[in-house]
Curated annotation (Swiss-Prot):
Organism this protein belongs to: Salmonella paratyphi A (strain AKU_12601)
Protein's job: Catalyzes the tRNA-independent activation of glutamate in presence of ATP and the subsequent transfer of glutamate onto a tRNA(Asp). Glutamate is transferred on the 2-amino-5-(4,5-dihydroxy-2-cyclopenten-1-yl) moiety of the queuosine in the wobble position of the QUC anticodon.
Positions annotated to bind ATP: 231
PANTHER family recorded: GLUTAMATE--TRNA LIGASE, GLUTAMYL-Q TRNA(ASP) SYNTHETASE
Pfam families for this protein: tRNA-synt_1c
Name of this chain's protein: Glutamyl-Q tRNA(Asp) synthetase
Length: 298
């Protein structure tokens, strides 16, 4: 039972198993929700089949359960939400808030990577075209509950970004906003690598006339080369053995109170301790390099 209107979520993509960096995002969002006696949901962001690894989604859910991170309600699968995305696209089109773009990627690269609105007034049809938002509400800054006021790159914030890809796939920024609104998410706790797209997502909330959630961007776990731990750079999967030492590592990474007697606790007791003593203000804002992160699963 909860007595709070707080709703948080963890939304991994099934491009591989969870690693230590994933655990930081999952644990941070879980603790922030549970400390406020709120709801914590899980969503599988499986809208990009070329990047998905067969069986990864089921493994991710097993990993969360193994680490004691039990979610509320049913898992939401983006692959089952296409109709909702189509309805959102149709509404934007009807309101004159989107347009078709046939510009090749090479042209945008020549512009320095920021689209210049070339197709905005050309009235292209849908054939072999992407759909771009007609930016009406650029967001130049936003408040992060951990980091304070974050300023956006003005060019990035003002860009007419893609919401439906030329290959027929729904863009991440559209899907995440539609789903967070649908699930009633009140605060999004995720990694700092997602700070940049936040202003685009906030502008979509304004386009739709929806209330936006709050944001917390956690520090990233880096490998010994200074790169973010990720599935793309082959970060090792989380341990399938005793999850407690890895949870303790993750809590230390998040700047939380040390669990001195964790060996005497069950996973459930360890997490209850972490919820009771959770302090968002103790979380560092800088990324952290530690060789142990690369070995957290070994």
């Amino acid at each position: 039972m909860t007595d709070s209107h707080y709703i948080g979520r963890f939304a991994p993509s099934p491009s591989g198993e969870l690693h230590f960096g994933s655990l930081i995002a999952a644990l941070g969002s879980y603790l922030q929700a549970r400390a406020q006696r709120g709801i914590w949901r899980v969503r599988i962001e499986d809208i990009d089949p070329p990047r998905e690894v067969p069986g990864a989604a089921a493994t991710i859910l097993r990993q969360l359960e193994h680490y004691g991170l039990h979610w509320d309600g049913e898992v939401l699968w983006q692959s089952q939400r296409h109709e909702a995305y189509r309805e959102a696209l149709a509404w934007l089109h009807e309101q004159g808030l989107s347009y078709y773009c046939t510009c090749p990627r090479s042209r945008i690269q020549r512009l320095g990577g920021i689209y210049d609105g070339h197709c905005r007034t050309l009235c292209h049809g849908p054939e072999n075209a992407a759909v771009r938002i007609k930016q009406q509400h650029p967001v130049m800054h936003f408040h992060d509950a951990l980091r304070g006021d974050i300023q956006a790159d003005p060019q990035l914030a003002s860009e007419d970004f893609i919401i439906h890809r030329r290959d027929g796939l729904f863009a991440y920024n559209l899907a995440v906003v539609v789903d967070d609104h649908f699930q009633g998410v009140t605060e999004i706790v995720r990694g700092a690598d997602l700070i940049e797209p936040t202003v685009r997502q906030l502008s979509l909330y304004k386009q739709f006339g929806w209330r936006a959630p709050g944001y917390v961007h956690l520090p990233l776990a880096l490998n010994e080369q200074g790169a973010k731990l990720s599935k793309q750079n082959h970060a090792p999967a989380l341990a399938t053995g005793d999850p407690r030492p890895v949870l303790v590592q993750a809590l230390r990474f998040l700047g939380q109170r040390d669990v001195v007697a964790w060996q005497e606790m069950s996973v459930e007791e360890l997490l209850r301790f972490a919820v009771t003593h959770w302090r968002l203000t103790a979380v560092p804002t800088s990324a952290n390099v530690n060789p142990a992160f690369s070995n957290a699963s070994r």
